[in-house]
Structures are given as structure tokens and as C-alpha cells.
Amino acid sequence: MPRPKPRSPRRRGRPPPAAPPPPPARPRARRYRPGQRALREIRRYQSSTALLLRRQPFARVVREICLLFTRGVDYRWQAMALLALQEAAEAFLVHLLEDAYLCSLHARRVTLYPKDLQLARRLRGLQGEGF
């Protein structure tokens, strides 16, 4: 059987364009140890003096409660009055949560339960379950 003659490879015009390089892989997200982010968040909130609740939603709640107690009469609120009320409300909530956390520590727990909040309210003498 005769051997085939060697042929030069065919040229088919331009070579195909090279594929674009793949986008650089994003570095993997850092894995923090459990509780590390929570501790950082606690430190951030302890060092800040900014309000924790947003102004507009708080103002809506205040106006809604005001409508309930004034039988539908809509009162106007000054911005400084709403700000003072929000400061007082946040200070009250923070202090209540601190007391409730102490109640949970007294029970040799780390988790804050609703019964801790109820005990803190009862020890403070806060009545009323509605609002």
C-alpha cells in the first residue's frame, strides 16, 4: 500500500480570536469565628451616640398613638419635640434591656428570654401590658 504524500496544513484565513481572559476570581469572604461579628457590633453601638431608631418610622408611631388618645384630633409635632421623645424612648429601652440582661445572668443564662423582660418591668414597677 503506498504511503500518502505529506501535505502542508490548510490555511483558513484568520485564526479565531482568542477567548477573553476569565474575570479575576473574587477573593473568598473572610470567615469570622462565631460571635466575633456580634462583639464588633456591640462595641460599635456602645461607642456611638447616634439614634438607633429611624426618625420617620418613630414619628409615625408617635402620631398614631397621639391619634388614639386624642379621639382623632391630629396634633402637630415640632421636630425638636419628636427628637426629645425619641431620645427618652431609646434611653428607656436600653436601660430596660440592660436590666433584663442582668436578670438572665442572675438565672445563669446568656440568652435573653421574654420572662427576663417581664421580671425587669415588674421590678421597676412598670404596669400595663397594652402599650
Curated annotation (Swiss-Prot):
Q: Which GO terms describe its cellular component?
A: CENP-A containing nucleosome; condensed chromosome, centromeric region; nucleoplasm
Q: Report the Pfam families cross-referenced here.
A: Histone
User: Is Amino-acid biosynthesis tagged as a keyword?
Assistant: no
Composition bias, Basic residues: 1-14
Q: Which Gene3D superfamilies match?
A: Histone, subunit A
Q: What keywords appear on the UniProt entry?
A: Centromere, Chromosome, DNA-binding, Nucleosome core, Nucleus
Q: Where does the record place it?
A: Nucleus; Chromosome, Centromere
What CDD domains has UniProt attached to this entry? HFD_H3
Region: Disordered, residue numbers: 1-33
- Segments carrying the region annotation (H3-like) are 34-131
InterPro entries per UniProt: Histone-fold, Histone_H2A/H2B/H3, Histone_H3/CENP-A
Compositional bias of kind Pro residues: 15-26
User: Example GO biological process term?
Assistant: mitotic cytokinesis
> A GO molecular-function term, please?
protein heterodimerization activity
Its main localization is nucleus
Q: Which cysteine pairs make disulfide bonds?
A: none
Q: What does this protein do?
A: Histone H3-like nucleosomal protein that is specifically found in centromeric nucleosomes. Replaces conventional H3 in the nucleosome core of centromeric chromatin that serves as an assembly site for the inner kinetochore. The presence of CENPA subtly modifies the nucleosome structure and the way DNA is wrapped around the nucleosome and gives rise to protruding DNA ends that are less well-ordered and rigid compared to nucleosomes containing histone H3. May serve as an epigenetic mark that propagates centromere identity through replication and cell division.
Record's subunit section: Component of centromeric nucleosomes, where DNA is wrapped around a histone octamer core. The octamer contains two molecules each of H2A, H2B, CENPA and H4 assembled in one CENPA-H4 heterotetramer and two H2A-H2B heterodimers. CENPA modulates the DNA-binding characteristics of nucleosomes so that protruding DNA ends have higher flexibility than in nucleosomes containing conventional histone H3.
Q: Which family does it belong to?
A: Belongs to the histone H3 family.
Its name, as the record gives it, is Histone H3-like centromeric protein A
Query: Top-down, what is the taxonomic lineage of the species of origin?
Result: Eukaryota, Metazoa, Chordata, Craniata, Vertebrata
